[in-house]
Curated annotation (Swiss-Prot):
Keywords: Acyltransferase, Glycerol metabolism, Lipid biosynthesis, Lipid metabolism, Transferase. Pathway: Glycerolipid metabolism; triacylglycerol biosynthesis. Its EC number is 2.3.1.20, 2.3.1.75. One of its GO terms (molecular function) is long-chain-alcohol O-fatty-acyltransferase activity. Bifunctional wax ester synthase/diacylglycerol acyltransferase (WS and DGAT). Catalyzes the terminal and only committed step in triacylglycerol synthesis by using diacylglycerol and fatty acyl CoA as substrates. Required for storage lipid synthesis. WS uses C(12)-CoA to C(18)-CoA substrates whereas DGAT prefers C(20)-CoA. Upon expression in E.coli and Pseudomonas citronellolis (DSM 50332) both WS and DGAT activities increase. It is an enzyme of class 2 (transferase). Disruption phenotype: Cells lacking this gene do not make wax ester and only trace amounts of triacylglycerol. It comes from the Bacteria. One of its GO terms (cellular component) is plasma membrane. This is O-acyltransferase WSD. One of its GO terms (biological process) is triglyceride biosynthetic process. The active site is at 133 (proton acceptor). It catalyses: a long chain fatty alcohol + a fatty acyl-CoA = a wax ester + CoA; an acyl-CoA + a 1,2-diacyl-sn-glycerol = a triacyl-sn-glycerol + CoA. The gene is wax-dgaT.
Amino acid sequence: MRPLHPIDFIFLSLEKRQQPMHVGGLFLFQIPDNAPDTFIQDLVNDIRISKSIPVPPFNNKLNGLFWDEDEEFDLDHHFRHIALPHPGRIRELLIYISQEHSTLLDRAKPLWTCNIIEGIEGNRFAMYFKIHHAMVDGVAGMRLIEKSLSHDVTEKSIVPPWCVEGKRAKRLREPKTGKIKKIMSGIKSQLQATPTVIQELSQTVFKDIGRNPDHVSSFQAPCSILNQRVSSSRRFAAQSFDLDRFRNIAKSLNVTINDVVLAVCSGALRAYLMSHNSLPSKPLIAMVPASIRNDDSDVSNRITMILANLATHKDDPLQRLEIIRRSVQNSKQRFKRMTSDQILNYSAVVYGPAGLNIISGMMPKRQAFNLVISNVPGPREPLYWNGAKLDALYPASIVLDGQALNITMTSYLDKLEVGLIACRNALPRMQNLLTHLEEEIQLFEGVIAKQEDIKTAN
């Protein structure tokens, strides 16, 4: 038995029927050409009869303010096998994921489920993994899944994700003396971080407000249809994009790939809101999580936030891109002057009011930001599960009261995998955002082509 971490407690406290606090991932696999007709059934049976033992946190359940080992762990509660009705189109798959992502996890059991889904067109099957954010963040979740798969197409009998022993499982068995030493060291580092945080607040934030046109702070986000109270119903949409297209745009315009990603999202959001006559006159503000991990730990929440000006009030895509670049660069320069502990303390002070707003359920006229846009680094080499190649992986995140849309992306091989999750009742035809993303990429490619034509003509 171990006490809840404060961050674990926050994620658990935020949860209510219309606001589930789990994250998920949809993994699409290609069945090998020479596989028997019983390939998926054999895979499921191997998992069910596996003698591998679940490791923390997958064998932990809630017990008041503590995590306790589930001594009656029942794999059938967590692991399920279903089939889509014929013809098993991606549309039906996404509808099923939307429904599954809308339901709460059972707090009487360890807070995760895994579904194997067969019958998908193109001789494919899928795995949908859902786990509470109190257990894992996005970066940690990606690392966990990567560890549970193989880089070798010939490797068989791979251990299920919930049996892969990571650093947290080992850390939970650490002697008490070692834990106490780490706690004291953490307190010391927090105290040492305080002077630098105060200096940054006085020299950077307060000077930027009102002077730097690209600076954005909490509660500057305009009112929009993205910022409504949410219901329990979700809509999930996903699509893969060629990562080289983003690289080429970034190289041609001398910006980072992340700048281009944010600019493409900005243009798509602008087009979506305009189609619903709901574009605010002031720019949307995105909260962009940034990992500050300095090790290879596979769990815990080690993230800070950047508030990015999306410049959706500008019609010119190049102007939007430049404003986004400067806005993100301002935050990055600030964080470069701080250690990870100083960044966490700084973020707590600057973004604390926004967190209090979410926890309390209050809905002020102005939100801290309009939506979350997250880009999680993923595996660069092909992954396999008992010889089945992982074709695509799509993240599914969280929406909250006042934050009815979340855009989460991850890279895999040469692709950018985009997962959109939204409140179905708040945002009509949300899947059209995927079309607008493609249109915005083409818009930037057209701008670059014109620039090259001008250079050639001269």
